[in-house]
Amino acid sequence: MTMGDSDLRKPTNFGTGHLSRRRSWCCSFAVPPASPDTRSISSRNHIPAKSQQQRPKLVPCSPQSSKSALNIVNRIDPRRILSPGRVSPIDSDPTVTTMQETETTQEEEDDAVVVDSTPNLRSESFRAPKIEVTGSGLSEGYDARLSLKGRNGGGVLVLELSLEVLAANSDVFSGLIAEEKKCSSSSSSLGLKNTCRIEVCDVENLGVFRETVELMFEESNVIIKKFMTMGVYRAIDVLEVAAGIKFSRAVLSCLKYLEAVPWTEDEEEKLRRLLGIYSFDDDAVSEILARFNSNETENLQDSLSKKLVWSITSCSDVNPRNELKSLVKGLLCKSSVYEKEQPEINKEDIYRAGKCCVDSLAKLFEEGSSSSSSKKEKPLIESISREVENINWLLEIMIDREIAEEFVEIWGKQRRLVEMHERVSPMVRYEVSRVTGAIFIAMGKRRVQCGGEARAGLVEAWFKPMLVDFGWLQRCKKGLDMREVEEGMGQTLLTLPVKEQYQVFMEWFRWFSKHGTECPNLSKAFQIWWRRSFLRGVESSTCR
């Protein structure tokens, strides 16, 4: 032990241990006390200067540096291993050795960051994508460079490919390669690498074009599996590119896939447009074309519509009848989303079905007026309600097709039905007024333009039954908007000649004064009629 050590071992001469420890750290030439921390320092200090100079700088993360770091960790006093956020009670002031180790560790971390960041920079740099060739017998090098330029500056994509594969799969690329080889003799004489360069401009979708080229390196059975992964919409895009570059294997595989899977309406329209642009082999595309409509189905549409209408009107079950009504109405109406230049529906078939429903309704009313048994009342009501629903359903189709004018005339001539209306029970007869209410609504909204004779016949026949049944209609609306019924009745009455308006409005006034809310409220139309008939008449006579 040296003299410096003996001097440091005399804490009692100074009174406290704190002063002796403070003295040991204040003196830069003093030797610290023996401890696990100072062993490495003493061993370091005894290393010759020559060996220190010849010691090479260790590369971070090398086995040698890891070993030295492990030795340092083993020499650390267990008391110095603290949890994060705690302050050590020992050696609160940093020592020279600690500072050196900290600087060395920081340098190693900086070097590690530099080394680790290098591969990231390389991976982010642009490299032309290559298509791997497996099992084709080709050399590992690529002798063709395909440059794809997107439409309207949509980017550039460069593919390094095999010249033999391109020429074998695409007739278009085969011709371009043949032209390029004619011009390659000059570059070969200059010692340049003989690489065929092909450029395709105005590419709509670079990703689809690349997927199509990648299929050249696959077997035919694998190509179909690729299409199954893509889906129908993407497969149609690939089919368009394959047809453009005359890649027959992909075209045949795609057509085979499309024929075997269902399509959405958007996919069907897209495929229909593509088949109209490119000409495909008849044998390959015949099964797909068979799924589209043909002339035979177009000729059968008229008779099919007739069969559907008659099937619905004769259906006795309520739930399927209502479901089919909604379906067929959506198909036959002009505003239908299914309409694709469909021909006009046969007007006579609709009118024939409507006339048949009206005749059935008249027979049911005759049966109800002559029947005295209460057992038949419930089936009779159900039958009458079904026929009324059929008439209203056909009327909606007629109104949408703008062919309802003649039906209004037919309904206004049902004198026999009007006569039986008075003899039938109110809970049965009000169903008929639902048809009259629907006609009044359509006329009030100007969706049906009838002649004066047809309007007069409708009001003459069905205005009084509407007054009688209005209370029942209010209680059993069945989808009928009573406000619209009142508005439609008032507007229709105002289209009649003034003399006829006088008789109708006076009749309404008497009914409304007796029955009140059980009668339709035509006050607004009555005021208009009053002003037209009297006030404006006085003004016109004064002007004369």
Curated annotation (Swiss-Prot):
Biological function: May act as a substrate-specific adapter of an E3 ubiquitin-protein ligase complex (CUL3-RBX1-BTB) which mediates the ubiquitination and subsequent proteasomal degradation of target proteins.
Presence of the UniProt keyword Glycosyltransferase in the record: no
Protein name: BTB/POZ domain-containing protein At2g13690
Alphabetic keyword roster: Ubl conjugation pathway
Keyword Magnesium: no
Domain notes: The BTB/POZ domain mediates the interaction with some component of ubiquitin ligase complexes.
Pathway it works in: Protein modification; protein ubiquitination
Span list, region Disordered: 34-66, 82-111
Compositional bias of kind Low complexity: 93-103
Feature: compositional bias, Polar residues: 37-55
UniProt-listed GO biological process terms: protein ubiquitination
Annotated organism of origin: Arabidopsis thaliana
Annotated BTB domain residues: 142-225
InterPro entries cross-referenced by the UniProt entry: BTB/POZ_dom_prot
